[in-house]
């Protein structure tokens, strides 16, 4: 049995209740939170539900419902094929908005297309093909599962070796020293997540990039769990 020491600790837990009573009222803190107003911008079907799985699927913004309805009724519904005259540029236009607002990327560098998994597959496939004389792909064990499954399939298809850095202990964080032990002239691609989906650990993107590039490897970062959450300056 673990011994708990404390001058004010009582067996009936009264000291804990007293401490809790002295804490600020959570409702008061919520009301003063500058981000509190954003709650009303999302669809909340069950106000009693404490939803903590936003890394998998976030709540539906009310604005999204309005935008989709407008597109269906006023654009597709009325413009029909004529809508392609401006739809064709939407991937670039929306990509530029995402790039400037969340990625620190200048105009012309970001496209809003396909799904994360499709894009990840295409980019990693292109990177492997761009280094035909190299036979190794490096990632980490704590990376998002779908990314690892895609890498396994690509390596099997291209006859490459997949090396997964063991970072599942502690913060699930790949240090520069850890990466340096696994990259060399055989490394075609290094791919990691900017923010780890379980632990929330934030990687040192610039430093890890330099280590991989110094070895002649290409790098693909999955920013799915970082965009809009942490400040990024890809340029």
Name each region found by the language model.
Residues 2-235:
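Pyridoxal 5′-phosphate
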């Amino acid at each position: 049995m673990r011994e708990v020491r404390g001058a004010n600790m009582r067996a009936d837990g009264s000291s804990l209740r007293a401490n809790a009573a002295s804490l600020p009222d959570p409702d008061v803190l919520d009301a003063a939170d500058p981000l509190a107003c954003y709650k009303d911008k999302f669809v909340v079907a069950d106000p009693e539900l404490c939803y903590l799985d936003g890394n998998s699927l976030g709540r539906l913004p009310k604005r999204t419902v309005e935008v989709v309805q407008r597109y269906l009724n006023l654009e597709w519904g009325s413009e029909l094929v004529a809508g392609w005259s401006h739809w064709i540029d939407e991937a670039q236009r929306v990509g530029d908005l995402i790039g400037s607002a969340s990625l620190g990327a200048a105009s012309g560098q970001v496209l809003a297309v396909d799904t994360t998994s499709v894009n990840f597959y295409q980019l990693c496939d292109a990177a492997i093909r761009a280094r035909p004389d190299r036979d190794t792909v490096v990632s980490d064990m704590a990376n998002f599962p779908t990314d690892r499954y895609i890498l396994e399939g690509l390596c099997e298809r291209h006859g490459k070796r997949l090396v997964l850095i063991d970072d599942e202990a502690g913060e699930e964080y790949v240090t520069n020293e850890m990466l340096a032990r696994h990259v060399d002239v055989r490394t075609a691609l290094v791919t990691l997540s900017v923010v780890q989906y379980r632990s929330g650990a934030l990687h040192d993107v610039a430093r890890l990039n330099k280590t991989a590039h110094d070895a002649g490897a290409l790098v693909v970062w999955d920013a799915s769990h970082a965009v809009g959450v942490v400040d990024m300056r890809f340029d």
